[in-house]
Design a protein with these regions (language model features):
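Alpha-helical transmembrane bundles and membrane-interface segments of multipass inner-membrane proteins
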Residues: 1-171
Length: 171
């Protein structure tokens, strides 16, 4: 873990940032009645508060035991994924490049904060609404996951190209 500590620093800071922002957004919107959208850039970017989450919509019948079991399973799954990533990082053999550490850290921050929100509120709230593009409303955790994926994929593609060029030059 020491070799790739930037992953954990980015994950910790990102998680605190995301959970804090999402808590503030929930507090602001749930104190307003009726719920309304707040234009940040009119017609382009709005804060639109929507509650829900696909995971808990599976349990619409209010079956308490299933809900408790699903939460426990969800928590255990996230813990297992975190330990798996930690194990992979320790087996990497050498320090990962900074870009990949940041990408993995962003993905972890988004996943952990979505999990925290799901556990505390029984749902995930989405609020970032790009009106300029036809995309679903999303939250900050989703953005961190997406950005982490983009950074990681770009890094791995360039790493592959660099390796291919090196192989080509040696032949």
């Amino acid at each position: 873990m020491n070799k790739n500590r930037l992953v954990w620093i980015v994950a910790a800071i990102g998680t605190v940032l995301i959970v804090s922002v999402q808590y503030c957004i929930r507090t602001i919107f749930e104190s307003r009645q009726p719920l309304e959208t707040i234009p940040l850039l009119q017609g382009i970017l709005h804060l639109t508060y929507l509650r829900g989450g696909a995971f808990l919509s599976l349990f619409n019948n209010n079956v308490k035991q299933l809900l408790i079991l699903s939460r426990i399973g969800f928590i255990l799954f996230i813990i297992a994924v975190t330990f798996f990533i930690s194990w992979l990082l320790s087996r990497w053999g050498k320090e990962m490049m900074k870009a990949l550490q940041i990408g993995v850290g962003l993905i972890l921050a988004g996943a952990i904060s979505n999990t925290v929100e799901q556990i505390i509120f029984n749902e995930n709230a989405v609020f970032i609404d790009f009106r300029l593009f036809q995309i679903p409303v999303f939250n900050l955790a989703d953005m961190f996951i997406y950005l982490g994926q983009v950074i990681s994929v770009i890094y791995l593609v360039f790493l592959g190209i660099k390796f291919a060029i090196k192989q080509w030059r040696t032949n």
